[in-house]
Regions:
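Long beta-strand-rich cores associated with HINT superfamily self-processing modules
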Residues: 39, 541-577
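Periplasmic binding protein-like
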Residues: 52, 124, 263-267, 281-283, ...
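N-terminal lobe/hinge region of extracytoplasmic solute-binding protein
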Residues: 53-106, 137, 206-209
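Gly/Pro-rich hinge or "lid" segments in bacterial periplasmic/extracellular proteins
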Residues: 84-89, 181-237, 241, 251, ...
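Extracytoplasmic/peripheral linker and loop segments enriched in polar/acidic and small residues
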Residues: 109, 317-321, 325, 333-334, ...
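Surface-exposed binding/hinge segments that line
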Residues: 114, 148-192
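Ligand-site clamp/hinge motif
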Residues: 116, 201, 229-275, 422, ...
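Structural transition elements
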Residues: 343-388, 408-416
Length: 618
């Protein structure tokens, strides 16, 4: 065997089955809290509890249904991966997931993994290679949409003994070490009807996994409570519980940070970034994350999808690419994101990858789309979209071009960007109907069906994607096969599809990089998306009274909300040592701090991973 990798046992983002789930607004229950930030909830016998604030409630705890990034965060510490990602550099290495080592055959088609014999399920049952084989075969045999692209080219998975699992592939599999598939307990999930797993099965707490924490309670719109797994095979977490508190108002969350009611918060208001950083004990960071926010077009082919309501001009790449010149990304960053983003261009995140393995494609300076309204007008003229009657609006087949643009009520950024884009597009001669709707309504429009036929009901939208460390996921979103599934723009390109398959089976890194970069170039020129920005996520933590915060991505990422367990396992009150040795803290009633607001709810960017809509709401 070749490419052996074995190390002695030592101690990320997002595709889903889109379901009709609208995050409900909740007027939260009040709670008595300790104001000094060093104490933790002690309603259950003095437990050390880490309280974290976020604005993005999980949509579903079933990993075959949920798609919000907050759901992924829960799964990342409730379950384990076969091969994990090292927090400091996101590298796939042994002993971060269940695998302690692996080997590949000379032809790259057979992968043999050795897994730890120390991990146990949170109900006490041993975790074995049979659970790993079951998880992957369950997905393969039932073609479960959320993970189906991860298992592409895997024919079968076998467990010859308790610590060995063998993957047999039809072709070499370049991303074999980067499969974000949570390993599930066979003794529980084998009883779940595959026909219901994508639409009915709720996976209600307590959720049995093998990770450092277990989800024991979830009140939608209020909180998620997770208990430490004291038998975690890499060592028990230093705390007893985590409470993820869902806020409907960012300013309230910021005030609770100042008061010490929460120890850290993700997606803090941009206006509060510096003030919070100036508070005693608090530190604020801007974290580089894998992801993008985009202006997407409904590119659905009217011949194949006659019920699509997308304007016909959006099928023309010349029309779409002309609009690239009509978007000022510097203003998008400064006005839309308060400078908490980097200008976007390519499909993969700039500045994220290792220089020796950089998949990002840089548009050549002499052919890059730069903001120039005159160039946009010229390109539209050359594409045949002119103003024939002199009313200031360009025409298609004698009728004014009127396009619907949707921004999300949950995202102030998308709303500000929508207003800017509406103004620029009007300046180049388009009639824009700008509307603000919620996530659920937008998802309904993107995955609309009329009498059983796919009928996407939109023209343009502003949303975003979270990605994986490996580029395969975000590339898969734009394949033809993902239409009616992960694709939200319904674009189809034969060369892109062919390259997508080829890069998956190209083991040589530099050869694969060349293929992936060519794919990005195609997307850039065809413009099914105009990539607006690579957002920076904002976090604040109480580093004065709590220690053990582990920042991911070579100190450029986040402390938490990064699908990495490191911070959750290590963080604890300053001077307490560990949860078992630190003793009780100041008494506090466990509750949820959710502001009661009827209008003007402010929730920052929601990164999502999308999948096909399930037939039945879970």
């Amino acid at each position: 065997m070749a490419a052996a990798c074995t190390v002695s046992r030592g101690r990320l983002l997002i595709a889903a089955v889109v379901v009709l789930l609208i995050v409900g607004l909740s007027w939260g229950i009040g709670s008595a809290v300790a104001a000094d930030g060093s104490a933790s909830p002690a309603a259950d016998g003095g437990k050390t509890v880490l309280r974290l604030g976020w604005t993005n409630d999980p949509d579903n705890l079933n990993p075959f249904i949920g798609y919000e990034s907050s759901s992924y965060e829960i799964w990342a510490i409730n379950y384990e991966l076969l091969v994990g990602f090292r927090a400091e550099d996101y590298a796939n290495v042994p002993d971060v997931g269940l695998a302690t080592g692996w080997e590949t055959s000379d032809d790259g088609k057979v992968w043999t993994f050795t897994i730890t014999d120390q991990s146990r399920w949170q109900d006490g049952e041993p975790l074995t290679a049979r659970d790993v084989a079951f998880t992957f075969n369950y997905i393969i045999d039932n073609e479960l949409g959320m993970f189906v692209d991860y298992v592409k080219f895997i024919d079968k998975v076998e467990a010859p003994d308790d610590t060995t699992v063998v993957f047999t592939c039809s072709k070499p599999k370049a991303n074999m070490l980067a499969l974000w598939v949570p390993i599930l307990p066979e003794h529980i999930w084998s009883k779940v009807d595959p026909s219901e797993v994508e639409n009915k099965f709720k996976n209600e707490p307590p959720i049995i996994g093998s990770g450092p924490f277990q989800t024991v309670e979830w009140k939608k719109g209020e909180f998620v409570r997770m208990a430490a797994n004291k038998d975690y095979w890499r060592g028990a977490p230093a705390i007893d519980e985590i409470i993820f508190l869902t806020y409907q108002n960012q300013d309230t969350m910021a005030q609770d940070l100042k008061a010490g009611h929460v120890q850290s918060a993700w997606n803090i208001p941009a206006a509060q970034f510096k003030p919070l950083n100036n508070e005693p004990d608090l530190e604020s960071i801007r974290g580089v994350v894998i992801g993008l926010d985009e202006l997407g077009f409904n590119c659905a082919d009217k011949k194949k999808y006659p019920k699509s309501t997308g304007h016909p001009v959006l099928q023309d790449p010349a029309f779409r690419s002309a609009l690239q010149y009509a978007v000022d990304k510097e203003k998008i960053v400064s006005i839309g994101y308060n400078d908490n983003a980097n200008p976007g261009d390519s499909l993969l995140t700039r500045g994220f990858y290792d220089p020796d393995a950089d998949f990002y494609w840089t548009p050549p300076a002499d052919s890059a789309y730069t903001f120039d309204l005159d160039k946009a007008r010229q390109a539209l003229d050359e594409a045949g979209y002119t103003d024939g009657d002199g009313n200031g609006i360009r025409e298609y087949k004698g009728k004014d071009i009127r396009l619907r643009l949707y921004a999300r009520s949950e995202s102030p950024e998308s709303q500000k960007c929508g207003k800017l884009i509406t103004g620029w597009f009007k300046e180049v001669g388009l009639d824009i109907d700008f509307q603000i709707i919620d996530d659920g309504a937008l998802g309904d429009k993107q995955y609309n069906y009329e009498h059983g036929e796919f009928a996407p009901d939109f023209d343009m939208f502003i949303w975003g994607w979270g990605g994986d460390v490996d580029p395969n996921f975000i590339l898969s979103v734009l394949t033809t096969g993902s239409i009616e599934s992960w694709s939200d723009c319904n674009w189809s390109n034969a060369e892109f599809d062919e390259l997508f398959l080829e890069q998956q089976t190209t083991i040589d890194l530099q050869e694969r990089i060349a293929l992936v970069q060519r794919m990005q170039e195609i997307v850039y020129r065809e413009s099914p998306y105009i990539v607006l920005v690579y957002p920076l996520d904002l976090e604040t933590a109480n580093k004065g009274k709590w220690t053990g915060w582990v920042r991911a991505g070579n100190d450029q990422g986040l402390w938490w909300y990064n699908t990495q367990p490191d911070t959750y396992v290590a963080v604890h009150p300053e001077g307490s040592g560990s949860a078992t040795a630190g003793g009780p803290n100041t008494a506090l009633v466990v509750g949820v701090l959710v502001a009661a607001v009827a209008v003007g709810l402010v929730i920052l960017r929601v990164v999502r991973r999308r999948g096909r809509r399930a037939e039945t709401e879970a």
